[in-house]
Amino acid sequence: MNKNRMKSLKEDYKHFAFTLLAVSTFLYIGAVLPDQGLTLGQKSTMFLADCVFLAGAFFCADRSLIYKKRLEEADE
């Protein structure tokens, strides 16, 4: 894999991680705010979706770090 492709993947995964983290933050705030008229099932669904988005953010951040290390190894 060439350096430009790895650099592009590193940046893409970093952007995905930040986007997923932002979405999960808004979902968490929406689930935690009181008196929104949400049922227990809806809150549970929002917390589950929040966990999925956080897991995706951690996965993307990890992939970004992997490509960063590969780029550093390729430079040596």
Swiss-Prot record:
Subcellular location: Cell membrane
Membrane-spanning ranges: 16-33, 45-61
Membrane topology reported for the UniProt record: Multi-pass membrane protein
GO cellular component: plasma membrane
Coiled-coil region: none
Highest taxon, organism lineage: Bacteria
Record keywords, A-Z: Cell membrane, Membrane, Transmembrane, Transmembrane helix
Main localization, broad class: membrane
Name this polypeptide is given: Uncharacterized protein YrhC
Name of the gene this protein is made from: yrhC
